[in-house]
Swiss-Prot record:
Gene3D superfamilies: Hexapeptide repeat proteins (2.160.10.10). The gene is caiE. It comes from the Bacteria. This is Carnitine operon protein CaiE. Pathway: Amine and polyamine metabolism; carnitine metabolism. NCBIfam families: PRK13627.1.
Amino acid sequence: MSYYAFEGLIPVVHPTAFVHPSAVLIGDVIVGAGVYIGPLASLRGDYGRLIVQAGANIQDGCIMHGYCDTDTIVGENGHIGHGAILHGCVIGRDALVGMNSVIMDGAVIGEESIVAAMSFVKAGFSGEKRQLLMGTPARAVRSVSDDELHWKRLNTKEYQDLVGRCHASLHETQPLRQMEENRPRLQGTTDVTPKR
């Protein structure tokens, strides 16, 4: 793992969290229990404080950053999709930010909300609970349905389970030169399927 102290501040990572070895955590970063931080994620706490609360996940290639005297927060069980950028914002408890979305300074995403993939949430946006946000700039299009929230929670549970699976079995290795016969397929821990 790449952890860097900055001006006397050292990242804090709960022992039950999983941080991928290629992720980078700098300075004022606080990672809670059972959090998953994916490959190539960059959490730069060299200006503002970055807080990732219990059970949340920050997936591959995500960036977290913020201005001085601000907190960038991912709430409990927050779900941040691949390549998303969070800058000086607050993501509410049990909310999902879709892949490659950008959430700007001072924006607040409400609890149990979903930000669709590729959305741009403008600085200062103030969301409400359980909104579906989409577009560039993002706007609330409707409420998140019970089925959508259930789907989100199953996906988040997969990442929470992945924490333990990574602690138990992830290690650096050399590639095989050819595929073995009867190569097994990996299985998830829930019955979640892709949204279509």
